[in-house]
């Protein structure tokens, strides 16, 4: 293992210490698009985690054989192949979720987090470290998606995973659903509050 970085650090640091969305401000588009429901956010989190981990692994395995002039093309080809596999599995076994996620599974190919880890880490590190780093960054991305989706679905519709938590007034209950949280701008507010919370907890993340 290079330097003093442990597998534990590679796996856990992206969740709070160096979160791809909260600190690096990457992957924001999908964080807005797929977080209206916890179910879609959870599936997207798993998909990105698998693609990031496996793409890092494969890029690292062949890194010494990739000509520098075409390294980005090779990385994209590996990532695209993995995304196609994930997309086909979703269509085969979870067609409803695949329809809800729509084009956003395919857009994992252009996700800055996936490309960034392949270029910045996997091209310079051994396979096992690269795989763990990819899984860690996928978990960091996924954890933010799940946090955002939790609040958006709960406040926006009174549900979690499609199950009623707060009975809405329309259905004879007491809760007035806030439709604003089902719109994309609400995700910005939630992400902002999470960033504020993280930087209050970890002052070293605050920009000078």
Swiss-Prot record:
Q: Does the record bear Metal-binding in its keywords?
A: no
Q: What is its main location?
A: membrane
Question: Where exactly are the transmembrane stretches of this chain?
Answer: 42-62, 72-92, 103-123, 131-151, 178-198
- Topologically, how does it sit relative to the membrane? Multi-pass membrane protein
EC assignment: 7.2.1.1
- CC annotations in GO: plasma membrane
| Key words, A-Z | Cell inner membrane, Cell membrane, Ion transport, Membrane, NAD, Sodium, Sodium transport, Translocase, Transmembrane, Transmembrane helix, Transport, Ubiquinone
> Which cellular compartments is it found in?
Cell inner membrane
Gene Ontology molecular function terms on file: oxidoreductase activity, acting on NAD(P)H, quinone or similar compound as acceptor
Catalytic activities: a ubiquinone + n Na(+)(in) + NADH + H(+) = a ubiquinol + n Na(+)(out) + NAD(+)
Q: Superkingdom of this entry's organism?
A: Bacteria
Gene Ontology terms describing biological process: sodium ion transport
Q: Does the keyword Transport apply?
A: yes
One short Pfam name that applies is Rnf-Nqr
What this protein is reported to do is described as: NQR complex catalyzes the reduction of ubiquinone-1 to ubiquinol by two successive reactions, coupled with the transport of Na(+) ions from the cytoplasm to the periplasm. NqrA to NqrE are probably involved in the second step, the conversion of ubisemiquinone to ubiquinol.
User: Do you know which HAMAP family this protein is assigned to?
Assistant: NqrD
- Describe the protein's quaternary organization and the partners it interacts with: Composed of six subunits; NqrA, NqrB, NqrC, NqrD, NqrE and NqrF.
Matches recorded under PANTHER family: ELECTRON TRANSPORT COMPLEX PROTEIN RNFE, NA(+)-TRANSLOCATING NADH-QUINONE REDUCTASE SUBUNIT D
Family per record? Belongs to the NqrDE/RnfAE family.
Protein name per UniProt: Na(+)-translocating NADH-quinone reductase subunit D
Q: Which organism is it from?
A: Haemophilus influenzae (strain ATCC 51907 / DSM 11121 / KW20 / Rd)
